[in-house]
Amino acid sequence: MYTALQKIHKDKDAEPTEFEENVAQALFDFENTNQEIKSDLKDLYINSALQIDVSGGKKAVVIHVPYRLRKSFRKIHPRLVRELEKKFSGKEVVLIATRRILRPPKKGSAVQRPRSRTLTAVHDAMLEDIVYPAEIVGKRVRYRLDGSKIMKVFLDPKAKNDTENKLETFAGVYRKLSGKDVVFEFPLTE
């Protein structure tokens, strides 16, 4: 029997939480009710899901998808996010690929760490996942006098209509997942 629990695969046989089961059930229902997207959703599953409080009393749903399936999820991203936001009314949905950060190799060891497993690379890729379908066109890091850093991220103005109302959510999700402050802006066009 094909059930909603097959839509979630946790690491090392960990039990899914109640919220993760709700997200998996929503994916399962969406697959069964929508015929045009059924073939795209058939083989897709998620790793985990969590709810994050964003400023202003808003909540965001962060869904971690397997790294290998991120291209398939991106094909149906706009429709899937729209449907999930309807299901979890008032909450914005963000899809992020699951990535691992490896610690730096010990001094004197010959082991090389791939660039894609460094903290910087994982955080940059996470930022791109969060703002998808908008594209990042530039970044600036501002150092304040007290030593704190704030990153300004410029998004593609073409996606302004779709993403303008979600910028606060994006910043809150990124701050929660990486611990870094970020401000999203659209560059001024002459």
Swiss-Prot record:
InterPro entries: Ribosomal_eS7, Ribosomal_eS7_CS. The keyword Ribosomal protein applies. The keyword Ribosomal protein applies. Pfam families: Ribosomal_S7e. One of its GO terms (cellular component) is 90S preribosome. Keywords: Ribonucleoprotein, Ribosomal protein. GO terms for biological process: ribosomal small subunit biogenesis; rRNA processing; translation. GO terms for molecular function: structural constituent of ribosome. Belongs to the eukaryotic ribosomal protein eS7 family. This is Small ribosomal subunit protein eS7. It comes from Avicennia marina (Grey mangrove). The lineage of its organism: Eukaryota, Viridiplantae, Streptophyta, Embryophyta, Tracheophyta.
